[in-house]
Amino acid sequence: MPGPCASAAAFSCILVLLLLGCQRSNPLAAGATVSSMRRLTDTINIGFLAEYSQMRVTLGGLPLAIEDVNKNPNLLPGKKLAFKPVDIGHKMSAYRVKPLRAMTQMREAGVTAFIGPDESCTTEALLASAWNTPMLSFKCSDPIVSNKSTFHTFARTLAPASKVSKSVISLLNAFHWNKFSIVVSSKPIWGSDVARAIQELAEARNFTISHFKYISDYIPTTKTLSQIDKIIEETYATTRIYVFIGEHIAMVDFVRGLQNRRLLESGDYIVVSVDDEIYDSNRRVNIMERNYLDPYIRKEKSKSLDKISFRSVIKISMTYPQNPHIRVPIYGLHLYDSVMIYVRAITEVLRLGGDIYDGNLVMSHIFNRSYHSIQGFDVYIDSNGDAEGNYTVITLQNDVGSGASIGSLAKMSMQPVGFFAYDKNSVIPEFRYIKNDRPIQWLNGRPPLAEPLCGFHGELCPRKKLDWRYLVSGPLCALVVVVAIALLIKHYRYEQTLAGLLWKVDMKDVTVINLGEYNNPTNKNIFQICRQSILVVGEPNKRSFTNIALFRGNIVAMKKIHKKSVDITRSIRKELKLMREVRHENIINFIGASTDHGSVIIFTTYCARGSLEDVLANEDLHLDHMFISSLVSDILKGMIYLHDSEIISHGNLRSSNCLIDSRWVCQISDFGLHELKAGQEEPNKSELELKRALCMAPELLRDAYRPGRGSQKGDVYSFGILLYEMIGRKGPWGDTAYSKEEIIQFVKCPEMLQHGVFRPALTHTHLDIPDYIRKCLCQCWDEDPEVRPDIRLVRMHLKELQAGLKPNIFDNMLSIMEKYAYNLEGLVQERTNLLYEEKKKTDMLLYQMLPRPVAELLKRGDPVEAECFDCVTILFSDIVGFTELCTTSTPFEVVEMLNDWYTCCDSIISNYDVYKVETIGDAYMVVSGLPLQNGSRHAGEIASLALHLLETVGNLKIRHKPTETVQLRIGVHSGPCAAGVVGQKMPRYCLFGDTVNTASRMESTGDSMRIHISEATYQLLQVIGSYVCIERGLTSIKGKGDMRTYWLTKRQQPELTPDLISTVDTLDTYCSGPRESMEVSVHQYCSPASNNYRLGSCNCDTKCLYSRRSDDNVTNSHGTSEFPKVSEPAQVNCNQLCVCRLNSSQMFNNRGPRSAPSITFRL
C-alpha cells in the first residue's frame, strides 16, 4: 500500500494535469493570454505566495527588494518591477487547492515568476514546472523539490538541513578524522536527514562510521540521561570522534556524560556538534551552561559543567548575517535574496535578447552560480537549485582583549574560528581558519587522533615483555591511596557537618507568644515591641502574618510545615545547611527548624511591620516615591543574591513573601527547602494555589511537573507582577472584571484570546507610570522566557527609579522613618476628627430616644433611679375608626399613614416643652413637667399642643384615601406620677401611676376631634388663663366612678396680631430696638409652688429671629444695648428687625430635651 507521501504526490500530479487539461481545452484563450503577457514591456509582475498570519515580520523583505530593484539603474533598465501578493492561508492538509487557484489567476494576469510559497511547496513547484515558469522559495524545506528532472524551474535561497553534511565531512577531512561515530537525537525533525546525508558522503569518501546511535524523543529526564550513559558505555572504547546531531540541550547532557566518565580531560576525545542554531557574534552567551538554556530544569552548581570539558567541543552552526545595518528575521533576508537573484537572472536574459517567460532559460542563469547575499557573504546555488548555506566553526576561545593567556579558563567563551569556502569543481567545501593566528585551542596542544597509534585495543603495537610503567605503578598506587584518604577525610567532615544538626531548634528553648494575652507580664514587653506593626497594618487578627515566639531572648517567626510525617533525608539536611549559610540584608535569616513530635516548624527572624501585601492593602499608609523606590531596590538586591547563590531561584515571589522589618527594610522569604515542603497539606490550599498562580510565569503554569524552585526567568516575570502591584496598590492584576480562575486560564492559554497574550493593563488610563517602567514591565512579562531580561538587567532598567535615593543607607532609613512619623500624625488627627463626628451623631440619636439627663447618666454608667413628680400633665391621642380603617387598607398603607401622622406630630411637639413617651399602634402619649420640672406650665404646654394637633389634623389627608382625613380623639389629665428607665437592653423611659390610667380614660371617653380634659387640668388652666373650656358634666370613668370633665375648645390671645404668636417663658426678656417705640404687656401669675413667671407678647411689624446664647445682650443693626427687666404690662412694637434671646441662667436649664423654643414665630 503506498504511503501518505506517495498519495500526496499522486494527488498533486492529478491537480496539475487537470489544470493543464483545462488550459489545453481552450488553446485560443491560452494563446491570447500568453500573447498579452509577452506584450507587457513596461512593468514586469511577479507573484508572491505566503501565509500572512505566520510571516508578518518576514513579508517586509519583499517590498524592500522591489524598491531597491527599481532604484538600481543596472537592473531591468527601462522597466519596472511589481508584485502581486496572495495570502494562501494556513496549511491544513497536503492537498491545498487555494495556492494552485491563485497561481492560475496570477499567470493569467501576466506574472513572469512566483516567489514562495513558505513551508510546503511540492505541489506549487510541480505546477510551475509544468508551466515552465520560474519559482523561487525562501522558506520551503521539502527535500523532493531538489529533483530537477521533475522540478526544473524551482530554486530556493534557504539551504536544506542536509547541506550541513558537506561542512561536517570537510571538517573531518581537514583533521584526518576518518573514523567517527554518529549520535542522533530524534527530537529535531531534520536530524535524521542530516545523519543520512553525512553517512552517504562518508561512505563515498571511504570514511568509517564506527557506531550509529539514536536518542529517541529527548527530554531531560533521568530515563533519557541513562540512555545517553548507555550509548557512551557502548561506544567510548572504539571511537574518539563523536558527531552529535541534535538540540543544544541534548548535546550538553551528552558532554556531561563524557565528563562523568572522565573522558574529556586528556583531550583524546572530541565532539562535533551540529544543530540549527544561528550563531550571533555580538552575543557573548556562555552556551556551555546548561542552566542558561534549560530554564525549567535546574542543576546544583556542584553538578554544572566545567569549562575544560567544552574545550573538547567543536560546534558547526549557521553563519549569522554579517550586514550590521540589517536586523530582521532570517527568512526576511532569504526573501530579499530570492527577488534579487531572479531580477539579476532576467536582466541577463533581456541583455542577451532572450525570453523572460522561458523558465528553463531564466533558471540556467541561477543554477551553479554564486550571489552576494544581503546577509553579508556569498551564497552558492548548486545544480539542484539549492543554496549551499554558510556555516561557521565555533570553539571555546579566550575573549578578545581579556588579557588572559592562551589556555586560561578565566575568560573564555565560544568564539568562531573557521568557515567553509565552496568551489563549483569540488563536492565538499574547504575548511579555512578565519584568522591564521587564531587557531583552535586544543586541550593537549594538538588535534586528537581518530584512532590511537596502537589501535583501540593495542593491536597495532607489539607488546614488550618489560614495561617501564610497571616500575612506577607502586608509587602511583600509593599516591592514589593518599589522595583517596584525603578525599575521604574531607567527605567525612562534610558528613559530620550534615549530621551535626546545627540547624535544629529544641522546642524547650521556644516560648510561643500570644499577643492577645496582654495582661500576661511575660508578653507585655513583647507587645510593646510588636505594636508598631499593628499601627501599620491594623489589628493583629486581621493580618496575614505568622505566629511569633521567643527563642534565646530574640523574637522569631514560626511557620509550620503541614505534613503528617517527615523523614529528614540527606538531601533535606543539605537544604537546611544551605539555608543557614544564606546571609544577606534583604534575605530573611533562617534560624533553624524543629522536628519534634513528628511535625516541622521553621524559625526565621521576625519582621515587625508584616508583609508587603499588608502594607500595600493599608490605604491609610501613604507610600510616596521614596518608599516605593527603597522597597523595589531591596527586592532587586535580594533576588540578585538568590540568583547568584546555590539557591538559584525563588519560585514563589509575591508580595506576601516580602517582609518589612522595623527599619522599613524589605526582606525576601519563603524560598528554598523545596524537598522538605513537597507534599504538605496546607490549609486553604486551593486559595493559596490561586494566589501563587496569579504571579507565576505562563511557561510554569503550563508545566504539569514544574519544579518547586521555579526558574530565574519565572522570577523575573513574578517581579514584574510585584512591581505592578506596588505601583498600582490594587492587587497583582489591578482593577479587572475577571476572576482569579479566568486570569490564570487566559495567561496559561493565550490562544483563548483574540489579541494574544493576557497581561495586566498598562494603559495611561489604568496606570500613570513613566515610560521606562512600562517598558520594563513589558519585557518582564514577555511570553518567551528567553527574551526576558535577567534580574541584573532589570535593575539597570529601573536605575532611574532609584534616582532619589541617597547613597547612605542610614540617611534613607531616617528619611523613611521621618515621613512615616508625619503620615502617622496626620492619620491620628484624621481618626480623631472622625471619632468626634461619630460621637456627635451617636449622642444626637441617643437624645432622640431618651431624655437628655437620663441619657447622660447612662453614658456615664450611673444608675438611673426612679423619680416621683408632684404634678405633671399627660396627653393621650387616638385615631378614630383606626380598626375599621385597617380592615380596608393593606399593611403597607397603614404603616405609611401612621408614619405621616407621627412625623407630623413629632414636628409639632418640638415647639413645646413636652416629652414624647411612646406610641402604641395609633395611640400617641406625650407628657409635660418631667423629667425636668417646669412649675405649673405643663398644663398650658399640653393644652397648647392639643389645640395645635387638632388644628393640624384637619388638613392631614390619608394618602391612599385622599377624600378622607384623620379624625383625632385627645384626652388630658394632670396629677402626680413616677418615671424611670426600665430594662438594660433597649432601655425605655416609662411613666407609672394612676395619672397615666386616668389620662388614658380621658381619651377613650372623649369624642372625635375634641379635647377631653379632667377637672385637675381645668383648674391649672384657669390659673394660667386664656384657655376656653366648656363643662361636660359628670362622666363615668372606668375604675374612678363619676368625674367632672371639660372640653378644651380654644385659647384666647387678646391684643395679639395674627402675624405673630410668642410665648415668653423666662423672667428676663429683651427686645432690641428704640426704647420709645416699645410697649410691653406682661401678665403676672403665681404657680402653686409660689414661683413667679411672666408671660409677655411681642408684636413686631417686622420679622423676628430667635437665638439662644449664654449672655443677656441683644444685638441689632444699630449696635449693642441692654434693657432692664420687664416689670410692667406693656405692648412691645418692634419697627426694626429684632433678635430675642433667652437668659440661660433662668428657666432654660429646666427644659426637657424636646422642649419648644421659648419664642415661636409664625411668619
Curated annotation (Swiss-Prot):
Membrane topology according to the record: Single-pass type I membrane protein
Annotated signal sequence range: 1-25
Uppermost EC category: lyase
Membrane-traversing stretches: 470-490
InterPro entries in the cross-refs: A/G_cyclase (IPR001054), A/G_cyclase_CS (IPR018297), ANF_lig-bd_rcpt (IPR001828), Cyclic_nucleotide_synthase (IPR050401), Kinase-like_dom_sf (IPR011009), Nucleotide_cyclase (IPR029787), Peripla_BP_I (IPR028082), Prot_kinase_dom (IPR000719)
Catalytic reaction(s) noted: GTP = 3',5'-cyclic GMP + diphosphate
SUPFAM superfamilies tied to this protein: Nucleotide cyclase (SSF55073), Periplasmic binding protein-like I (SSF53822), Protein kinase-like (PK-like) (SSF56112)
Cytoplasmic side, ranges: 491-1163
EC number, as in UniProt: 4.6.1.2
Cellular localisation: Membrane
Keyword vocabulary terms for this entry: cGMP biosynthesis, Disulfide bond, Glycoprotein, GTP-binding, Lyase, Membrane, Nucleotide-binding, Receptor, Signal, Transmembrane, Transmembrane helix
GO terms, biological process: cGMP biosynthetic process; cGMP-mediated signaling; receptor guanylyl cyclase signaling pathway
Topological domain ranges for the Extracellular compartment: 29-469
Record-level GO cellular component terms: plasma membrane
Domain spans labelled Guanylate cyclase: 873-1003
Any coiled-coil regions, as ranges: none
Residues of this chain annotated as glycosylated in UniProt: N147, N206, N368, N390
Molecular function (Gene Ontology), one example: GTP binding
Residue ranges occupied by any Protein kinase domain in the UniProt entry: 507-800
Protein family: Belongs to the adenylyl cyclase class-4/guanylyl cyclase family.
Name under which the protein is recorded: Guanylate cyclase 32E
Source taxonomy: Eukaryota, Metazoa, Ecdysozoa, Arthropoda, Hexapoda
